[in-house]
C-alpha cells in the first residue's frame, strides 16, 4: 500500500493543494497565498469535489483578508464580504462552496468586537475547523454506509467522491476504506467519467494506492457489468442535494441511476449535511455549470472531433429522488419520503 495522497494542507501560512489536473502521471503539490490564486485553483479544478472546494474556499477567505490594513470594523467586514462574493463565483454548482463562505462571513460578523488582528486569526481557526470537521464527517458517512454493504460485494462508483474530493476517506469511497480496514474484499468498478476522467485518473489511482480492488470501465460499460450480475450496489457522491432529495452530481450520474433502477440495484448517495440545500426545493433549481468545449473534443491536446464542432458540456446532471435508494449522511441513513426526512436532519 502506497502513502495516501493529501489533497489539502495548511502549511507556512499558505494553502497547499495537490494539483489534481496532473494526476495520475505527476504528483505535484502547489502553494497558494492569495484569494485570487485559490479562485483559479477551484475554477480550473486543481482542487475539486464539493467538500474540498468548501475547505479551500474557507482558507481562501483568510488569505484574502490577511494583509488587509483597514482598521475600522465596517471596512473589515466590507472586505470579508467582498472576498466571499468573489470566491463564490469560482464554480456555481457545489453548495459546500457557498456554505463554507457563509460560515466564514458569519464568524466575522459574530466576532466583530475583536481587534482586526484577532479577527483574522479567528477566521483562520474557523477554516481549520471546517477542515477538521470534514475528516470526521467522512468517517461517519463510511460507518453508516458500511451497514448497507457486505464482504465480497461488487460496487460501482462514478466520478471521484474519494479522499481526493474531500480531506480524508472521501464520501462515496469512505466505506471502501473502512471495509479494507475490516479485512473485507469489496470489488469496486469505477466509471472513467467522461470528459475529465475523474473516475480513472483519480478514483482508480487512490483506491489502487490503498490496496483496494478496483477495475476501471468506460461509462458506456455500466449497463454491461450490471447485466452480468457484477454489481450489488452503486454509491456516488454529490455536489448538492435539493430539499426533495434530487441530487446534482457529476455528468453521467443520472444515466447510472436509471440503469441501477432497471436492474434493481440499490443506488446510494453519500452526502455530508453541508451538501444538503433545503433552500433549493427541487433539482430543477440547481444551477448547472457548463465548461469549455476543449474538455470534450481536445482533452489531450489533439482534436477528437472537427475543431468547429458544436459542443454541449454540462459538468453535472440531476438524478431525481425517485431513483435514489438512500442518502447516507454523517447523521445517518435517509430514505424516502426525502422532503420530510431530510428536514429532520436539521431539527
From Swiss-Prot:
The keyword Disulfide bond does not apply. It is an enzyme of class 5 (isomerase). It comes from the Bacteria. It holds the Pfam family IF-2B. Its EC number is 5.3.1.-. GO terms for biological process: L-methionine salvage from methylthioadenosine; pentose catabolic process. The active site is at 239 (proton donor). One of its GO terms (molecular function) is S-methyl-5-thioribose-1-phosphate isomerase activity. Substrate binds at residues 48-50, 91, 198, 249-250. The record marks 159 as: Transition state stabilizer. Pathway: Carbohydrate degradation. InterPro entries: Deoxyribose1P_isomerase_DrdI, IF-2B-related, IF-M1Pi, IF_2B-like_C, Initiation_fac_2B_a/b/d, M1Pi_N, NagB/RpiA_transferase-like. Keywords: Carbohydrate metabolism, Isomerase. Coiled coil: none annotated. Transmembrane segments: none annotated. It catalyses: 5-deoxy-alpha-D-ribose 1-phosphate = 5-deoxy-D-ribulose 1-phosphate. Catalyzes the isomerization of 5-deoxy-alpha-D-ribose 1-phosphate to 5-deoxy-D-ribulose 1-phosphate, as part of a 5-deoxyribose salvage pathway that recycles this toxic radical SAM enzyme by-product to mainstream metabolites. Belongs to the EIF-2B alpha/beta/delta subunits family. DrdI subfamily. HAMAP family: Deoxyribose1P_isomerase, Salvage_MtnA. This is 5-deoxyribose 1-phosphate isomerase. It comes from Bacillus cereus (strain ATCC 14579 / DSM 31 / CCUG 7414 / JCM 2152 / NBRC 15305 / NCIMB 9373 / NCTC 2599 / NRRL B-3711). The lineage of its organism: Bacteria, Bacillati, Bacillota, Bacilli, Bacillales. The gene is drdI.
Amino acid at each position: 500500500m502506497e502513502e495516501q495522497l493529501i489533497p489539502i494542507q495548511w502549511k507556512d501560512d499558505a494553502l497547499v493543494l495537490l494539483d489534481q489536473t496532473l494526476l495520475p502521471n505527476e504528483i505535484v503539490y502547489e502553494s497558494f497565498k492569495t484569494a485570487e490564486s485559490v479562485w483559479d485553483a477551484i475554477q480550473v479544478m486543481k482542487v475539486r469535489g464539493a467538500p474540498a472546494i468548501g475547505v479551500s474556499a474557507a482558507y481562501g477567505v483568510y488569505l484574502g483578508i490577511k494583509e488587509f490594513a483597514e482598521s475600522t470594523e465596517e471596512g473589515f467586514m466590507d472586505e470579508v464580504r467582498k472576498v466571499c462574493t468573489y470566491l463564490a463565483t469560482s464554480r456555481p454548482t457545489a453548495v459546500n462552496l457557498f456554505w463554507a463562505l457563509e460560515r466564514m462571513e458569519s464568524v466575522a460578523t459574530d466576532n466583530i468586537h475583536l481587534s482586526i488582528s484577532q479577527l483574522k486569526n479567528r477566521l483562520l481557526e474557523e477554516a481549520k475547523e471546517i477542515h477538521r470537521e470534514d475528516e470526521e464527517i467522512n468517517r461517519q458517512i463510511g460507518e453508516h454506509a458500511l451497514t448497507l454493504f457486505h464482504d465480497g460485494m461488487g460496487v460501482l462508483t462514478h466520478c471521484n467522491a474519494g479522499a481526493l474530493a474531500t480531506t480524508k476517506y472521501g464520501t462515496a469511497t469512505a466505506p471502501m476504506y473502512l471495509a479494507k480496514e475490516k479485512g473485507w474484499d469489496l470489488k469496486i468498478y469505477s466509471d472513467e467519467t467522461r470528459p475529465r476522467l475523474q473516475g480513472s485518473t483519480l478514483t482508480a489511482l487512490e483506491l489502487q494506492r490503498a490496496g483496494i480492488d478496483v477495475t476501471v470501465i468506460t461509462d458506456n460499460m455500466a449497463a454491461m457489468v450490471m447485466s452480468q450480475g457484477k454489481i450489488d450496489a452503486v454509491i456516488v457522491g454529490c455536489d448538492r442535494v435539493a430539499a426533495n432529495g434530487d441530487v446534482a452530481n457529476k455528468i453521467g450520474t443520472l444515466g447510472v441511476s436509471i440503469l441501477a433502477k432497471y436492474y434493481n440495484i440499490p443506488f446510494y448517495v453519500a452526502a455530508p449535511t453541508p451538501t444538503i440545500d433545503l433552500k433549493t426545493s427541487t433539482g430543477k433549481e440547481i444551477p448547472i455549470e457548463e465548461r469549455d468545449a476543449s474538455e470534450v473534443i481536445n482533452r489531450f491536446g489533439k482534436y477528437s472531433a472537427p475543431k468547429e464542432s458544436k459542443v454541449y458540456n454540462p459538468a453535472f446532471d440531476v438524478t431525481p429522488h425517485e431513483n435514489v435508494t438512500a442518502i447516507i449522511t454523517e447523521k445517518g441513513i435517509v430514505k424516502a419520503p426525502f422532503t420530510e426526512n431530510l428536514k429532520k436532519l436539521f431539527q
